[in-house]
């Protein structure tokens, strides 16, 4: 109930709310439970999930990874994917396979962008104050996202969701 309350309160007068997941999608408070995982948050809030999958150095294995997420818990709420660190050509081929095999949407991709790398450490990203040229990096990433991610499709997915009530 606390989660639903906080989302309802903070989403008031907003068109779209984005809930960012933590760690692995099914990783919860313990090693063998989904309690407090991003999966559980999606269930409690009845939110559709767009999984961001690293495709670095892979092709068909990306499909196996996605299939694993979809079948691990059949009620996963996963409605689509965005592939990260992938070439446009490979994305085009994999997107067709993702949509035909799994019936979920491939919303786009981000290519490898070495000039825009955001460092991380054990428990997450470094703080904004620690990132050199952050504003410029974000502008470059935003411009790329506008080119290679179906932002209208993501908005359409968001519009299909019933508002969370408390």
Predicted regions and their residues:
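Internal gly/pro-rich beta-alpha loop/helix module
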Residues: 60-166
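Short hydrophobic alpha-helical runs that function as membrane-insertion/retention elements
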Residues: 49-52, 107-109
């Amino acid at each position: 109930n606390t989660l639903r309350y906080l989302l309802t309160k903070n989403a008031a007068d907003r068109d779209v709310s984005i809930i960012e997941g933590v760690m692995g999608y099914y990783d919860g408070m313990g090693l063998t439970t989904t309690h407090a995982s991003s999966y559980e948050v999606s269930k409690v809030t009845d939110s559709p999930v767009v999984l961001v999958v690293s495709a670095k150095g892979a092709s068909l294995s990306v499909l196996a990874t996605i299939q694993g997420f979809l079948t691990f818990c059949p009620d996963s709420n996963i409605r689509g994917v965005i592939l990260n660190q992938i070439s446009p050509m490979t994305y085009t081929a994999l997107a067709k396979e993702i949509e035909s095999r799994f019936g979920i949407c491939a919303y786009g991709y981000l290519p490898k962008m070495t000039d825009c790398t955001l460092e991380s450490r054990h428990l997450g990203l470094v703080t904004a104050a620690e990132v050199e040229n952050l504003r410029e990096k974000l502008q470059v990433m935003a411009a790329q996202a506008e080119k290679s991610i179906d932002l209208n499709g993501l908005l359409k997915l968001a519009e299909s969701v019933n508002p969370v009530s408390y």
